[in-house]
Design a protein with these regions (language model features):
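Transmembrane alpha-helical segments of multi-pass membrane proteins
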Residues: 1-13, 72-87, 136-148
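N-terminal topogenic module of multi-pass integral membrane proteins
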Residues: 1-45
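Juxtamembrane "helix-exit" motif on the non-cytosolic side of transmembrane helices
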Residues: 15-31, 89-100, 153-164
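Hydrophobic, membrane-facing alpha-helical anchors
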Residues: 29-34, 49-70, 87-92
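C-terminal transmembrane-bundle signature of multipass membrane proteins
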Residues: 105-202
């Protein structure tokens, strides 16, 4: 279910970000390459990776529903999703440098970083043999992604919607909310798997 929701949020984000950039470009606005609060030229690139992320989430949803392992054919979409999250993270670093006095931009950057770490951990767990400490990494990165991606970003989007300041640019945050939910599911599954593993004595 979480992968299905994430796929929908990825596709919605791709449409919203592209429309925001297209309308701003069509209106003759001078667009920077990276911007945090307005349209930018990266809005023509990010939607491609968001679509790949949605496709990968759909593959995962169908695979888990059928009880089958993921095929290597879906690795390209997952890799594209990770590249997109990396680009999104770089965008936030460049467009909003961190400082102690700028708490919200710092939390935005931490949200992107947490989700990027989760994407890397999930790719390794899905397509490579799992090591003994794999569940610990999935648990840690999953909870971090849920805390920053779903709890913080979701609350921020809700606040923007209530105050009437929500814009199409904020659509780029939707994948963070979805991947945070996936992170929570991954963390809970990692705990369940680790408990079923027999104890090791030295």
């Amino acid at each position: 279910l979480t992968f299905s929701v994430t796929a929908i949020l990825f596709f919605a984000a791709a449409v919203l970000v592209f429309l925001d950039t297209f309308f701003a470009f069509g209106a003759g606005q001078r667009l920077p390459f990276f911007s945090l609060t307005s349209a930018d030229l990266a809005g023509f690139i990010l939607p491609v990776f968001f679509v790949l992320g949605g496709v990968w989430a759909l593959f995962c949803a169908m695979g888990y529903a059928a009880g089958k392992p993921q095929q290597m054919g879906s690795f390209g979409a997952g890799f594209g999703m990770t590249i997109g999250m990396f680009l999104f993270c770089i965008k936030r670093f460049v467009a909003s440098p961190t400082s102690i006095l700028r708490i919200m931009p710092t939390l935005d950057i931490l949200s992107a970083l947490a989700v990027l770490l989760l994407c890397c951990a999930m790719l390794r767990a899905v397509y490579l043999p799992r090591g003994a400490s794999e569940e610990k990494h999935l648990f840690l990165f999953g909870l971090l992604a849920f805390l920053f991606g779903t709890c913080f970003t979701g609350a921020k989007l809700a606040y923007l919607a209530v105050t009437g300041s929500l814009s199409l640019t904020a659509g780029a945050d939707l994948p963070l909310v979805g991947l945070g939910l996936v992170g929570l599911a991954v963390a809970l599954h990692a705990v369940h798997t680790d408990r079923r593993r027999p104890a090791r004595y030295t």
